[in-house]
């Protein structure tokens, strides 16, 4: 009888959610599936701006990974990856326990390292799981502070996250305390707002920011002086790799590019260790000269290919190739019941775009809620409880 294989998924990312969804429908016999993450309720990135603006409750935008694991027959381990030994095929967890694997998939997202800003609260847009408590403190301070002293908000980052977070937070604060003025400034070291989007979408974003009372400072680097004059700094600069990815001693020989992102081939597989897969923000897709955008839509589209290739690897079959879209639809919420649509040279705005975005996002998140509610799609033999440190 063949030995049980262990597939370990580290991270509660969008791609891993799809692996679990597929596993629930069609589990692989003879495989123990383990999911490791300190985040049980993982926010769907596409709905975060709407949640910031108050359009959604927090429970409406999260994927419940422990319940999804239960439905897929997977073991859930509430821990964080501390280090990796790719040669010995073992991950070391924040609990101090080692966890061996036959196959490993990393979908751990990215992070940000905001600088200290004297006199200002700093709200970092990554990692998403840390946003709810931090944002709750911001809203509490805004609503409970006596008087009507104006607040000055500074957004750092001229990409989609920077634009959406600024518009969303401004709208939320004004709705909560219409008696208090709030002023915004968006700072970006890029000479252009939303580089990569269509000219029409960039113009629409500029109009939305102006209508919200947000001034633009393009081609300007962040400085501590800016933070000193702000009540709140929204930090939405480019994604950064986690500390363990940037530390040679902790990544255990796994090949990374200069920024620490895991180098993967067209099959979403590590270029240095074929038994390791990576997807989403934590990965650098080698076939593209500059990699792929750090955007949720990329991880979502990698999900089905990742699920297929993990199954192929288990069976010893050749992997499939991931083919990124040359152009993909971007829908940016503007916090006022409207949105901006951009794809290639196309760009438009309106309430219809928000309704479109809302339908897409709710349909996406509903799939995981339904799967978690219904439980396993097929009957399966009961599994024994996992003890970290067990041999695979």
Name the predicted role of every residue range.
Residues 336-392:
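C-terminal auxiliary extensions adjacent to catalytic cores
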Residues 48-56, 119-124, 201, 250-251, ...:
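Short glycine-enriched, charge-decorated loop/helix-capping segments at active-site entrances
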Residues 2-75, 154-155, 160-196:
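Beta1-alpha1 glycine-rich phosphate/pyrophosphate-binding loop at the start
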Residues 76-83, 171-266:
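A Rossmann-like FAD-binding core segment of flavoenzymes
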Residues 2-3, 71-154, 234:
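FAD-binding core/adjacent interface of flavoenzyme oxidoreductases
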Residues 120-147, 227-301:
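FAD-site-proximal beta/loop scaffold in flavoenzymes
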């Amino acid at each position: 009888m063949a030995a049980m294989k262990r597939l370990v998924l580290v991270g509660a990312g969008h791609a891993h959610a799809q692996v679990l969804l597929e596993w629930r429908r069609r589990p692989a016999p003879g495989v123990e599936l383990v999911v490791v993450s300190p985040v049980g309720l993982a926010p769907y990135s596409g709905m975060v701006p709407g949640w910031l603006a108050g359009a959604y409750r927090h429970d409406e935008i999260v994927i419940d990974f422990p319940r999804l694991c239960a439905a897929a027959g997977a073991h859930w381990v509430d821990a964080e990856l501390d280090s990796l030994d790719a040669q010995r095929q073992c991950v070391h967890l924040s609990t101090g326990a080692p966890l061996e694997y036959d196959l490993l998939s990393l979908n751990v997202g990215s992070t940000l390292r905001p600088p200290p800003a004297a006199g200002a609260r700093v709200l970092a847009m990554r990692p998403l799981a840390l946003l709810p408590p931090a944002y709750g403190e911001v809203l509490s301070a805004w609503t409970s502070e006596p008087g009507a002293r104006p607040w000055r908000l500074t957004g750092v980052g001229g990409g989609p996250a920077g634009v959406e977070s600024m518009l969303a937070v401004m709208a939320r604060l004004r709705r909560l305390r219409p008696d208090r003025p709030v002023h915004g400034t968006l700072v970006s070291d890029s000479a252009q707002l939303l580089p990569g989007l269509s000219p029409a979408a960039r113009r629409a974003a500029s109009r939305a920011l102006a209508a919200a009372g947000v001034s633009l400072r393009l081609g300007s680097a962040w400085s501590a002086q800016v933070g000193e004059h702000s009540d709140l700094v929204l930090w939405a600069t480019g994604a950064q790799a986690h500390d363990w990815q940037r530390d040679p001693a902790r990544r255990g020989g796994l090949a990374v590019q200069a920024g620490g992102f895991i180098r993967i081939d067209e099959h979403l597989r590590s270029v240095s260790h074929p038994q390791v897969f990576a997807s989403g923000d934590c990965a650098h897709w080698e076939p593209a000269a500059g990699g792929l955008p750090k955007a949720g839509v990329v991880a979502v589209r990698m999900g089905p290919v990742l699920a297929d290739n993990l199954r192929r690897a288990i069976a010893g079959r050749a992997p499939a190739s991931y083919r990124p879209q040359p152009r993909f639809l971007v829908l940016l919420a503007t916090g006022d019941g409207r949105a901006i649509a951009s794809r290639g040279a196309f760009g438009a705005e309106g309430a219809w775009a928000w309704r479109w975005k809302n339908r897409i996002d709710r349909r996406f998140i509903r799939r995981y809620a339904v799967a978690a509610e219904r439980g396993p799609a097929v009957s399966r033999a009961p599994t024994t409880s996992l003890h970290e440190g067990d041999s695979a």
